[in-house]
């Protein structure tokens, strides 16, 4: 599929959304009561996340970047004070973004707006919910507040996403109330290798559980759950489904259209792109290209077209993960 064809599809989707909004407005004029999103049930939270499948969520730090993301076809943005690459370089304590900046982004674009809070920081998450963000990322990119415990997310109306390096880690986050999982990768490096490793680790354990389930060996599933400190019911559900029971995005080091296509090929439901777009020298083209490659990841011709839209000379500076000290790794936070 050519780029012009993909834009035609996006325009049809846009027209459909506008038609639905107009229908809603007419219904409201006729006295229909609209239930606000803030009263969302778990079913609505999971349903909203499912609508992001197959898309790209882009990290942004201001309204201008958010507009570029929306114009490129992103399904959402994640607002930060600094991009992960800059967080890594700056050091110190990384906190949630300025609430006024988040509000400004929400007023500027029409796609869902997400924001990060520190691991274990209940009140950062509560404030993000209060101002009306669509999704909260309890993220290892920011400086953890609690090294031992994550937020109990069932108390919130807004959905959460958490990072994971393995299936047990993912299932623990889901048990705590996460509506979405993403690979941790190694954020801010421009190196997709860790995201690949984490996605394969999750897939490998799912295949093992699926094998137990098909063989009728429920006791083996119970032993897996006990030895990995995860609820048996979640392990059993995962074994029965043959996949995570929630949407699973890829994140951490995605910097090119080919990176995005690779993660989709490995089984991701979509991708988060952090520094890869706005630390490059061609953010507009790269954003469009990554969206195109994510959407048509199983079409080599289209992925090649997307990759041709960008130049390696304009890519973000990469960081060799093997040269990072253990204490410099973000992925080890919040296991």
From Swiss-Prot:
<feature type="binding site">
    <location>
        <position position="188"/>
    </location>
    <ligand>
        <name>D-ribose 5-phosphate</name>
    </ligand>
</feature>
<dbReference type="GO" id="GO:0036381">
    <property type="term" value="F:pyridoxal 5'-phosphate synthase (glutamine hydrolysing) activity"/>
</dbReference>
<feature type="binding site">
    <location>
        <position position="253"/>
    </location>
    <ligand>
        <name>D-ribose 5-phosphate</name>
    </ligand>
</feature>
<dbReference type="Pfam" id="PF01680">
    <property type="entry name" value="SOR_SNZ"/>
</dbReference>
<protein>
    <recommendedName>
        <fullName>Pyridoxal 5'-phosphate synthase subunit PdxS</fullName>
        <ecNumber>4.3.3.6</ecNumber>
    </recommendedName>
</protein>
<dbReference type="GO" id="GO:0008615">
    <property type="term" value="P:pyridoxine biosynthetic process"/>
</dbReference>
<comment type="similarity">
    <text>Belongs to the PdxS/SNZ family.</text>
</comment>
<comment type="subunit">
    <text>In the presence of PdxT, forms a dodecamer of heterodimers.</text>
</comment>
<keyword id="KW-0663">Pyridoxal phosphate</keyword>
<feature type="binding site">
    <location>
        <begin position="274"/>
        <end position="275"/>
    </location>
    <ligand>
        <name>D-ribose 5-phosphate</name>
    </ligand>
</feature>
<comment type="pathway">
    <text>Cofactor biosynthesis; pyridoxal 5'-phosphate biosynthesis.</text>
</comment>
<dbReference type="InterPro" id="IPR033755">
    <property type="entry name" value="PdxS/SNZ_N"/>
</dbReference>
<comment type="function">
    <text>Catalyzes the formation of pyridoxal 5'-phosphate from ribose 5-phosphate (RBP), glyceraldehyde 3-phosphate (G3P) and ammonia. The ammonia is provided by the PdxT subunit. Can also use ribulose 5-phosphate and dihydroxyacetone phosphate as substrates, resulting from enzyme-catalyzed isomerization of RBP and G3P, respectively.</text>
</comment>
<keyword id="KW-0704">Schiff base</keyword>
<keyword id="KW-0456">Lyase</keyword>
<dbReference type="InterPro" id="IPR013785">
    <property type="entry name" value="Aldolase_TIM"/>
</dbReference>
<dbReference type="InterPro" id="IPR001852">
    <property type="entry name" value="PdxS/SNZ"/>
</dbReference>
<dbReference type="GO" id="GO:0042823">
    <property type="term" value="P:pyridoxal phosphate biosynthetic process"/>
</dbReference>
<feature type="active site" description="Schiff-base intermediate with D-ribose 5-phosphate">
    <location>
        <position position="116"/>
    </location>
</feature>
<feature type="binding site">
    <location>
        <position position="200"/>
    </location>
    <ligand>
        <name>D-glyceraldehyde 3-phosphate</name>
    </ligand>
</feature>
<feature type="binding site">
    <location>
        <position position="59"/>
    </location>
    <ligand>
        <name>D-ribose 5-phosphate</name>
    </ligand>
</feature>
<dbReference type="InterPro" id="IPR011060">
    <property type="entry name" value="RibuloseP-bd_barrel"/>
</dbReference>
<dbReference type="GO" id="GO:0006520">
    <property type="term" value="P:amino acid metabolic process"/>
</dbReference>
């Amino acid at each position: 599929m050519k780029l012009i064809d993909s834009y035609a599809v996006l325009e049809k989707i846009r027209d459909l959304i506008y038609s639905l909004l107009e229908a809603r407005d007419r219904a409201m004029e006729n006295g229909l009561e609209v239930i606000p999103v803030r009263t969302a049930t778990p079913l609505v939270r999971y349903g909203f996340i499912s609508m992001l499948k197959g898309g790209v969520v882009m990290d942004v730090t201001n309204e201008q970047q958010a507009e570029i993301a929306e114009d490129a076809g992103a399904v959402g943005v994640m607002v930060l004070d600094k991009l992960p690459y800059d967080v890594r370089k700056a050091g110190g304590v990384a906190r949630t973004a300025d609430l006024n900046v988040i509000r400004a982004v929400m007023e500027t674009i029409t796609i869902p707006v997400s924001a990060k809070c520190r691991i274990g920081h209940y009140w950062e998450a509560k404030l993000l919910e209060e101002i009306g963000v669509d999704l909260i990322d309890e993220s290892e990119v920011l400086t953890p507040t609690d090294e031992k415990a994550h937020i109990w997310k069932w108390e919130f109306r807004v959905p959460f996403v958490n990072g994971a390096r393995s299936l047990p880690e993912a299932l623990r986050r889901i048990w705590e109330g996460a509506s979405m999982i993403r690979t941790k990768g190694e954020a801010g490096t421009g190196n997709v290798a860790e995201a690949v490793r984490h996605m394969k680790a999750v897939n490998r354990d799912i295949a093992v559980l699926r094998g137990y389930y098909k063989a009728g060996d429920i006791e083996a599933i119970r032993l897996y759950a006990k030895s990995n400190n995860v609820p048996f019911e979640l392990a059993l559900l995962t074994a029965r489904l043959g996949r995570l029971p929630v949407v699973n995005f890829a994140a951490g080091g995605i910097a090119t259209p080919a990176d995005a296509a690779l993660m989709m090929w490995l089984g991701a439901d979509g991708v988060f792109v952090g520094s890869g777009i706005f630390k490059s020298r061609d953010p507009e083209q790269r954003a469009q290209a990554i969206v195109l490659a994510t959407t048509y990841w199983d079409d080599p011709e289209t992925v090649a077209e997307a990759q041709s839209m960008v130049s390696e000379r304009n890519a973000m500076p990469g960081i060799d993960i093997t040269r990072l000290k253990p204490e410099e790794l973000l992925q080890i936070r919040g296991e």
